[in-house]
């Protein structure tokens, strides 16, 4: 029976004079010769408990055997600490518990690392012993916030008339984007299920089924290369609505995010959110998820570059590329040539061949390429960039994609390095008017920029066959502080329109029927117009909790190589299991 009075981290002055019962883990033990002090910890925090022979000699005797991470139960009286030993850094810092009775519930071996807020243990060790890592206060607080976010989501959507509906985890493999995780069928020999990359098709079928408003906090799976903000399995807040347009979905989503920020962070955010088209985002920031907490926009200088005799600039423009610049205000004295060389190496990570630069001084432009700027060119540069004396101007000339990627990431790096970002600011932003298609140069074909079920803008339907690169989607992404928080669209709900989309993507009628025939059939039976959005829950928790990567906000995450150090998954299985699944392994040159 849980007979606790309260949690350790909630014992404050309101309990003074009361006899209470606490249970938790021993964080620290200090023996002062006759008195023993223990910091007792649970998920809500720590409280100091005192073993004093004046209160209980028996409890003191037991306390002499207690060590770190023992699980104990204590009975005692809450008293005020002496003023000299008050700890203002913790909620319970003004009180302590004088123990009259203690029970050792379970002992602990010495843990492989110190279980404290700050630890110098490697991440691999902490992931191997994740259940110990989860005891640390920063992670405990993070998962408390995760719960608060999902509670706010459920409360808001329930009040707004949404049904929470579960969709299948074992489903059909379809060519939607990343590689699928496949699950072999024992019963249907040689056939496979796939774990869902998203519930996209099922939530559309729910709209056809008349559910009107659906949501789900759902696990999704993508077998793709990992990075700091990616995991092979992740959780998204999945939403779909019938009889809506883009404005309806965006407004609903703003209301939900406003509720989350108020309930979880105590912050009132302004709605509606600012909006920016995809074209504006790429023009001014070089990226489709701009961090608008600081300025330093990219400036396109193709007109100026075409007038100059600098071959690097002129050649980039003539070959259909671009010349863009960013202005680092007041940085001409802060960055030496060596510092700028380091920035150049960073830009090269994103494909740039080099990083040109000039400094604006009393005597005009100064730097390796200053000689290529005639007086009129220099004047035009300063007008275009609004650069002033003391500023540093950085240029990249290359293909549009390289220029944008290198300067966008360089801008973000400089924003952090120079302290231009207010870390307490939450800048939400909509990016709209997305291209419907993306072109893959290597494969020489178009792909859906979001997914094949996104509706094109009505006025662009006729261009599906003739000008794919100009077709815009009824799609919208919500961005927070330079991260894509979620994305959505108005869906195709007409069979003929969906056929046109598949055709534009290079599907034959047979391929479309094979992969998506069940959806096409559903469109025959009165599909309502519908749209929705999906937001990354893990990423939202990461951003609101100030954590640096997704592994910190998932209870049992995978490593960068998609392994679980705790359970050693993935692992080999018995030959008998493979035989039952009709699978033979063909692994060459594999070492594991």
UniProtKB/Swiss-Prot annotation:
Binding site for ATP: 222-224, 231, 484, 536-539
Chain residue ranges for the region called Aspartate: 200-203
Entry's localization field: Cytoplasm
Gene Ontology molecular function: aspartate-tRNA ligase activity; ATP binding; catalytic activity, acting on a protein; nucleic acid binding; transferase activity
Record keywords, A-Z: Aminoacyl-tRNA synthetase, ATP-binding, Cytoplasm, Ligase, Nucleotide-binding, Protein biosynthesis
EC number of this enzyme: 6.1.1.12
Pfam families hit by this protein: GAD, tRNA-synt_2, tRNA_anti-codon
InterPro entries linked: Aa-tRNA-synt_II, aa-tRNA-synth_II, aa-tRNA-synth_II/BPL/LPL, Asp-tRNA-ligase_1, Asp-tRNA-ligase_1_N, Asp/Asn-tRNA-synth_IIb, AspRS_core, GAD-like_sf
Binding site for L-aspartate: 176, 222, 450, 491
Ligase in keyword set: yes
Catalytic activity: tRNA(Asp) + L-aspartate + ATP = L-aspartyl-tRNA(Asp) + AMP + diphosphate
Gene Ontology cellular component annotations, sorted alphabetically: cytoplasm
Transmembrane segments: none
GO BP term, example: aspartyl-tRNA aminoacylation
Subunit: Homodimer.
UniProt similarity note: Belongs to the class-II aminoacyl-tRNA synthetase family. Type 1 subfamily.
Function of the protein: Catalyzes the attachment of L-aspartate to tRNA(Asp) in a two-step reaction: L-aspartate is first activated by ATP to form Asp-AMP and then transferred to the acceptor end of tRNA(Asp).
Name of the molecule in the record: Aspartate--tRNA ligase
Species the sequence originates in: Macrococcus caseolyticus (strain JCSC5402) (Macrococcoides caseolyticum)
Encoding gene per record: aspS
């Amino acid at each position: 029976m849980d007979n606790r009075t309260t949690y350790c981290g909630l014992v404050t002055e309101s309990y003074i004079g009361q006899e209470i019962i606490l249970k938790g883990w021993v964080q620290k033990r200090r023996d002062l010769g006759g008195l023993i002090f223990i910091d007792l910890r649970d998920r809500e925090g720590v409280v100091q408990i005192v073993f004093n022979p004046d209160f209980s000699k028996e409890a003191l005797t037991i306390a002499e055997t207690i060590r770190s991470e023992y699980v104990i139960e204590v009975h005692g009286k809450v008293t005020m600490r002496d003023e000299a030993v008050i700890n203002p850094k913790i909620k319970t810092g003004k009180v302590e518990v004088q123990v009259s009775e203690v029970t050792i519930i379970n002992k602990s071996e010495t843990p492989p690392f110190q279980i404290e807020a700050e630890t110098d243990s490697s991440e691999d060790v902490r992931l191997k012993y994740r259940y110990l890592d989860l005891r640390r206060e920063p992670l405990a607080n993070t998962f408390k916030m995760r719960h608060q976010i999902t509670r706010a989501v459920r409360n808001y959507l329930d009040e707004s008339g949404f049904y929470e509906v579960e969709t299948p985890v074992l489903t059909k493999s379809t060519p939607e984007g990343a590689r699928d995780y496949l699950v072999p069928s024992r019963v249907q020999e040689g056939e496979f299920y796939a774990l869902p990359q998203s519930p996209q098709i099922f939530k559309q079928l729910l709209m056809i089924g008349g559910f009107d408003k659906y949501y789900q906090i759902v696990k999704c799976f993508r077998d793709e290369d990992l990075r700091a903000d990616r995991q092979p399995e992740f959780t998204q807040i999945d939403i779909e609505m019938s009889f809506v347009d883009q404005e309806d979905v965006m407004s609903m989503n703003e209301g939900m995010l406003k509720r989350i920020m108020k309930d979880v962070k105590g912050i009132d955010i302004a709605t509606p959110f600012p909006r920016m088209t995809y074209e504006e985002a790429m023009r001014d920031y070089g990226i489709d998820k701009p961090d608008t907490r600081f300025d330093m926009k990219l400036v396109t200088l193709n007109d100026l570059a075409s007038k100059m005799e600098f071959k690097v600039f002129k050649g980039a423009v003539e070959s259909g590329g671009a010349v863009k610049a960013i202005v680092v205000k007041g940085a001409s004295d802060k960055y030496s040539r060596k510092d700028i060389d380091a920035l150049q190496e960073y830009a090269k990570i994103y494909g740039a061949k080099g990083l040109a630069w000039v400094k604006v001084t009393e005597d005009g432009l100064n730097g390796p390429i200053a000689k290529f700027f005639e007086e009129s060119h220099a004047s035009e540069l300063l007008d275009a960039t609004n650069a002033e004396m003391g500023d540093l101007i950085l240029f990249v000339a290359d293909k549009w994609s390289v220029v944008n990627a290198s300067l966008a990431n360089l801008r973000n790096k400089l924003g952090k390095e120079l302290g231009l970002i207010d870390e307490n600011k939450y800048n939400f932003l909509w990016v709209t008017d997305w291209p419907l298609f993306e072109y893959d140069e290597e494969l020489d074909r178009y792909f859906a920029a979001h997914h094949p079920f996104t509706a094109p803008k009505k006025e662009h339907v006729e261009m599906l066959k003739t000008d794919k690169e100009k077709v815009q989607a009824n799609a919208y992404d919500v961005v927070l502080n330079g991260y894509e928080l979620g994305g959505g669209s108005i869906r195709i709900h007409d069979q003929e329109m969906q056929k046109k989309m598949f055709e534009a993507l290079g599907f034959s009628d047979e391929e479309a029927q094979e992969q998506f025939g069940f959806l096409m059939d559903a469109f025959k039976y009165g599909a309502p117009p519908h749209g929705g959005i999906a937001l990354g829950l893990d990423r939202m928790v990461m951003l609101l909790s100030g954590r640096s990567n997704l592994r910190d906000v998932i209870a049992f995450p995978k490593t960068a190589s998609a392994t679980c150090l705790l359970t050693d998954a993935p692992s080999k299985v018995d030959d008998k299991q493979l035989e039952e699944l009709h699978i033979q392994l063909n692994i060459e040159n594999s070492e594991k």
